[in-house]
Amino acid sequence: MAIAKIIVDVPLMQTDQPYSYRIPEEFEGMLEVGMRVHVPFGKGNRLIQGIVLGLESQSEREEMEQDLKDIAEVLDFSPVLTQEQLWLAEELRKSVFSYKISILKAMLPGFLNSSYDKILYPMAGLSQEDRDRLFGSEDSLAFSSLDLAKQAEMMRLTRKGLLGLEYQAIDQKKVKIQSWYEVNLAQLEGVEISARAKKKLELRDYLLSHPESASLASLLEFYSREQVNFFVEQGAVTIVQKEVQRSAAYFEGIEASQPLELNPEQRQARDAVVSAIGSHQPPFLLQGITGSGKTEVYLQIIQGALDKGKTAILLVPEISLTPQMTERFIARFGEKVAILHSGLSNGEKYDEWRKVERGDAQVVVGARSAIFAPLKNLGVMIIDEEHEATYKQDSNPRYHAREVAILRAQYNQAALVLGSATPSLESRARAGKGVYQHLRLTQRANPLARIPEVQVIDFRDYIGQNETSNFTPPLLEAIQDRLAKKEQVVLMLNRRGYSSFVMCRECGTVDTCPNCDISLTLHMDTKTMNCHYCGFSKDIPQVCPNCKSCSIRYYGTGTQKAYDELAELFPEARILRMDVDTTRKKGSHQALLDQFGRGEADILLGTQMIAKGLDFPNVTLVGVLNADTALNLPDFRSSERTFQLLTQVAGRAGRAEKAGQVLIQSYNPQHYAIRFAKDQDYEGFYAYEMGIRRQLGYPPYYFTIGITLSHKKEEEVVKRAYEVMNILRSGLSETSNILGPTPKPIARTHNLYHYQILIKYRLEDELGPTLNQVLALTQERENSELRLSIDHEPQQFL
């Protein structure tokens, strides 16, 4: 008897193991490791999804002793998880403190985690006899409507290419199917047509001169269905169903590009990485100043991998925010590229996943989760802007794409490149110790482009001069100068909306979210106050909710308010605003950048999304309206993030022949992060910040574990937090430093109170067993409403 080892989709400590199920006779020899099934589970035999982890045979006596249940349904016609992904899940389980089923599900595309059916339809090669027997008068059949024997037969025919398969989800995530025609020239030449049937004669002549397969719709634009059916009945034309790629629009209008001539530093970097493919060398840190041509190096490294018969993954932070990067890779590699990111429609996501699964795509460009793309013969992975916090998933399973890439490189003997102008301190420290190979690009790729001049403007020098303005006189003068020269300006303000908060001047009440400990943000375009955490929204108050005073004032600033001020100061200027609110609609981000790139706007105002990867030769002025926004956040990485952001945004200026200028406004111009950013001095910042990290005992000198507890009742979360503290103190060695428990800086969101504990350690043998004890706390019945998360190397502390 055939047995399958299946892990079920019940993310609990007690069920984090494979269970044995009997494989029905109809599916013996067809079920494979990595396929999904429905199985009865628990006393009530509730049908739930599971993943096959192994197959084995058992004697009839052993099976009777175990009293195994049968698999109820096979969900896939082929494995949706590879052997590599199954190995990867087991390795990640050791560091992300998550259940194996949660890690496996993170590797699957979203549509496979939804409720759907499989729709089967006949392909051209299926005999008429089998078509009539299986489908009768129907054009297609739902897989779920068939008995087990018929399902097994359909699976065999699908594997032979005689049936087509369409995933049809409840929310219509499915294959896009079109009718195409195929011409049988031998039959067509023998068709007899009356001389009076001029349209049929015309259609025959067209088909004789255009015998290649094409969409039926293209014929029906000029000929009636009756005229086409005449040739179908004669056997001269066959109508077939074909899967159509919705992502085809990505490749339209993008001209093919050729490799650029590299400078000596770029060539050295490319050659070092390409030679490492297949030899399992340590990862590379490619540290290149802004404008040094890292992207062209990436392109040529990937070409080197393709030349060796290998595949490649490029990760980009928030890929929907960097359409220029996507276009460059499509221009170089064409339809070998698959795009995987959250900005795609559900249908597009499915199409791209299918391209990768079938081997039609050899290059994957995507955001964080694209690191799990099931590419075969993986040769190189590149993580662009490797310092970005978005590479760490902040929900379960809390993996870091960099650590996943290191494991995949180990499995495939692939090269791994971490690229950045401002590497994370952890990566730079590893390069300093020789754990990573350090490659540097110290000059701009365009020899005529110069590093822009950076000037810091002290806001305090202009106190008393229109204190409500976002703009100091030097910045206004610089904007006016660039507008007069017909050059473009980029302005960054890391806060969206109109004002930070609304306050009553009589009693000091600030309008806050009823679900979260956070002030509401004013949005004048919708005339609402919004919470950017839980989405709560209300109308702008006319009177104070506390004292009923009408003395309401708007404090702080935002991109919308800055936009209004710019429009008033420079009425002749064409201004574009780019933030989360103006780029919600699909394609709107691309449209705004295209508009700016065509010179249809003079000023681009936005949040930090404009700091990354934009390359416009006519941009000669970059202004940062307030460099202090992130400096004072309660996070030990706040200085590092401020330095990185300022350096990145400064790199948008002077990328071609025209000289660039950067103006940074700050209330704290002497802060070391701002001083080093002004001088574009990464190594100086690195040395200074490392001294602080060593003194305070933070990464990269120590590892960190963040534990967050959440509950509707504050007294309950405090009580459980101290229980966790007791477990940690009794389980961990004295060399580990345990901080907390304390309320999180934003202590309440979504009607839940949040407390956190931080563990700092270097070597801790008892870490795993102790944290498993902490996780066991959540399995107790009285803690059913407690939420507890364990985060290895947390990136955010708010």
PLM features: what roles do these ranges have?
Residues M1-I3, D16, N45, K486, ...:
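A general secondary-structure signal for short beta-strands and their flanking turns/coil
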Residues M1-V364, I371-V404, R408-S420, G434-N446, ...:
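Accessory, non-ATPase domains that flank or precede helicase/AAA+ motor cores in DNA-metabolism machines
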Residues D9, R131-L134, R694-P699, K744-H750:
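Short, flexible, solvent-exposed loop/turn segments with mixed acidic/basic and small polar residues
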Residues E166, V240, G366, M492, ...:
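Solvent-exposed beta-strand sheet faces enriched in polar/charged residues
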Residues S257-N263, R267, H280-V718, Q756-I757, ...:
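Inter-lobe coupling/hinge segments of SF2-like helicase ATPases
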Residues S710, E714-R720, L732, P741-E766:
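Arginine-glycine-biased low-complexity disordered regions
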Residues N726, S730-H750, L775, L788, ...:
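A carboxyl-terminal module marker
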